[in-house]
Amino acid sequence: MTFKFSVIKQRLLWWSISAIAILASVLFMGISFNQLQAPLRPSLDFVGGTKIQVALDCTVAGNCTDPLETATIQNVVNNQGVGSSTVQILGQERTTFSVRTPQLDVDQRSRLLDALESEVGALDPGTIQIDSVGPTIGRELFVQGMLALLVSFFGIIVYLSIRFQFDYALFAIAALFHDVLVTAGVFALLGLVLGVEVDSLFLVALLTIIGFSVNDTVVIYDRVRENLKADEGDNIDQVVDHSVQQTLGRSINTTLTTLLPLVAIFLFGGSTLKFFALALIIGFICGSYSSIFVASTLLAWWRNRNGQPPTVTKEAVNVTELS
């Protein structure tokens, strides 16, 4: 028994799911912009400054009896006159905290740590982590990352327009925007709820997602083009459905085998790679979904709407003449 699956018949459902996901993502980024003046919670990589993370020394008797309070640490930081700052309590036991401030020199950092120790108790020197990035470097990293994204989008449009046609490229880019927006929306929500910050690794993840998604879309589009050449009389809806059926197993298998190591990294990897892996997991799932259910159905809808014949290239005409 052959499994027949039609993406065209349920395309309004697929588009509705994507529309809801995109609207939710825009909403989360809007709330984040209202609260943080940025659509995502930026790390030091982008805004510059100093971040100090340290834990209480629980080997000292009674030092970790009471959990840390954000307000207590915030008052200490404010009294040091270091400017606007952000305090986060980390871990379930609430014995670790981080403080992010404008850029501090060595003396200012030492005074701040001394003041914190006198207020909240002994700090474990082995857990002190200090990161400092200048504001100019942060801006340069952000600009370079955005430029890389724009160049990748432009390159994809040019490549797909040459290999296929412009409408193929247009809907492939629409699918990529879908993947990037949904991934960013999830991280906007994580930034609001859990204080998750995005750094330069997040931009690397977005570029990787773009590459994965466009590759998946090209596989389906290539099958559509070949089927159009072989069956010129078929309706574009039939061709797209048949093409998706032919490539569905490949798309699912590729996505699953890619996700397995990423899930392992997310569950067992270090804190640096955890959210990088999560971004890739979300993006790859979205990329597979958009390639199968969004890019292909949009192409069929557009061709039907404009009354374009299914033949995509002169090459198809030549094949017919030779036969």
UniProtKB/Swiss-Prot annotation:
Keywords: Cell inner membrane, Cell membrane, Membrane, Protein transport, Translocation, Transmembrane, Transmembrane helix, Transport. The chain crosses the membrane at residues 13-33, 142-162, 170-190, 192-212, 248-270, 280-302. It is a multi-pass membrane protein. One of its GO terms (molecular function) is protein-transporting ATPase activity. GO terms for biological process: intracellular protein transmembrane transport; protein targeting; protein transport by the Sec complex. GO terms for cellular component: plasma membrane. SUPFAM superfamilies: Multidrug efflux transporter AcrB transmembrane domain. Pfam families: Sec_GG, SecD_SecF_C. It comes from the Bacteria. It is found in: Cell inner membrane. InterPro entries: SecD/SecF_arch_bac (IPR022813), SecD/SecF_bac (IPR022645), SecD/SecF_CS (IPR022646), SecD_SecF_C (IPR048634), SecD_SecF_C_bact (IPR055344), SecF_bac (IPR005665). Belongs to the SecD/SecF family. SecF subfamily. Part of the Sec protein translocase complex. Interacts with the SecYEG preprotein conducting channel. SecDF uses the proton motive force (PMF) to complete protein translocation after the ATP-dependent function of SecA. Probably participates in protein translocation into and across both the cytoplasmic and thylakoid membranes in cyanobacterial cells. Forms a complex with SecD. Part of the essential Sec protein translocation apparatus which comprises SecA, SecYEG and auxiliary proteins SecDF. Other proteins may also be involved. NCBIfam families: 2A0604s01, transloc_SecF. This is Protein translocase subunit SecF.
